[in-house]
Amino acid sequence: MASATRPATVRERVAESDRSVGRLLLVAAGALFWGWLAVSWVNRWLGGVLVPVGQPLVPPAAVEATLAGIPVLAAYAADAGFVVEMTPDLARGTWLTVVITGVSLALGFVIAVPLAVTRVYGRFSAWVSLAYTELLRGTPLLAQLFVLYYGLNLASYVPDAVSGVFAREVVWVAILGFTLNGAAYQAEYIRGALESVEEGQITAGRAIGLSKLETIYHVVLPQGLRYAIPSWTNEFVYLIKYSSLAGFITVPELYYRADQIAAETFRYTLIFLVTGVMYLALVLTASKLMVRVEERVAIPGLGAEREE
Amino acid sequence: MSDDDFLRVTDVSKWYGEEQVLHDVSFEMDRGDVTVLIGPSGSGKSTMLRCVNRLAEAQEGSILLDGEEVLSPDLDVDELRREVGMVFQGFNLFAHLTAVGNVALGPRRVLGLSETEARERAEDQLERVGLADQLDSYPAELSGGQQQRVGIARALAMEPKLMLFDEPTSALDPELIGEVLEVMHGLVDEGMTMLVVTHEMSFARAVADEIVFLDDGRVVERGPPEQLFERPEEERTGRFLERIASHD
């Protein structure tokens, strides 16, 4: 305990303040990004109460003029103005990326849990689950999307009830593709976690008269799903990025919009640099969020042996 | 052997693959009896215990519990386990639930009590094992002795007609054994029917109505503790008890 009372060295104090400055910058950047996204969405949803729909939240000319007045930044003023001009499109694309990722992830989870459970505890169904997982993980996601969109022409079968949710039916096809594919990957992560739940937990559940299924539901899943969070976060992060494949079946998400802007303006480097920052913001948010979730649902002693 | 034995085990045999681990094991108990299974490790005593609530499946023989054939293929094992409590060597507490959560799960999900009723029952049972001050602790926050007492409370909350103890103190540090044995003594005094696998010979001697000595999957000898401990008829029994005594 001596170390707890020892005064921090200068180096430690510098490192500590570096960390807090870093954290502050990260929080500020996050607030700016999500603020921009949210305000853009509200503005569009309310039919342009703040600025006309399709216009940037701040006038590009003003940004350009401001930067031009700052000596070190003057050289980038024109680029900045251009990027600001593109923000309405980028905001719409980013928003769609968020929705596609979130919905696919949630629906995929609903499928993944039973898949993982049957894989670990089923007999015949374990083989069905294995076949599904291997098929979906073993073939290219882009090929799966092409089969759903071009091959099966699923966009024309989207039920009327939900076809109006998005501007175009093809968004549902993308969500279906990511759900089915993501479920296979999520199931793999959850399966690994379920297998690490001790056998004695199941024995104890059965011994008080719970059925096998009840034991899985009340004992195995609450523990296994907590174990699964860190590796499951990988799937979350991957899905954000490979949702860009939806662009190849004409879903106007972030990548698709960026590609269109670039094709029209030939500003490839700049546009994809900015787009990269958008994806980075989404990914960082996702991983920070999952760390929070993990802390929130943590139980003393549970999973401690896994961290060793 | 009377017809109204509460538990009657007759010629139970069990194989793991090719290896026979139980050979025609027989014994019986009355309601309120305490029977202690003793024997060297690997003698099949834990396996025998687990056959009674079907955590292990005996291939031959008969186990009648309160007149019902436990080994019948038509038996609802969940129904059986509702009435037979079990305490494990490794505690096996549900790691994600507090002490109350562990004890309340069975009453809530198996017996169908309401959330409040289940919690009340769990609190009562934890109080019974002396853990009224640890209701909301997680297993990892409890000592081994406390964990095992939660394990006992968890089994008791189902109001079982028979309690099975599978080496309940073997995983405990010596200084923690006493508190668990004390709880078990209390159950004996309340008249609980108990089938116990243990190496605690002084406990066995003090509370058992009958001791069953198993070796190599066979009942070598059985009888009241004073007879088995003072005048064992079989040489193997004597040798085993001497070995155990020298470790005490």
Language-model region placement:
Chain A
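Transmembrane alpha-helices and adjacent helix-loop boundaries
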Residues: 2-308
